[in-house]
């Protein structure tokens, strides 16, 4: 069968967290951000601290120094992390979190310091065989071996795989 989580024999928990389905609707409020174009990014975060991959907006012009988001997605047992880029769309830095369907932020650019560590990641794929090697989870999907991000078993990068000529029938990590 397909492997997509962990269990202690009594309960189970999915390995990956599905990213938010939508970005909500941006609006402007007064604040202290430099005037310019920004992007915002959303992730879901579980109570255990695991965070989904980020979904990103297109450029949003902020003329009044603040950002308001309405119609945000919600998920039971998760908070929504809101990240904001620097002026003109570079990076993604934590602006705050919410458990409601709206969020407002009007702080300074210098307040945006904690980077989004899941930007560019994707949920870890589901596979039939799995292994653990040097802080990474390995999983086989037919003839492709995927690796998680180091010390982030719930995330992977779209380019972090190895394709083999035939179907994978076991995953057995070996150290030299």
Predicted feature locations:
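Disordered, low-complexity "stalk" and linker segments at domain junctions of extracellular
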Residues: 1-135, 141-143, 158
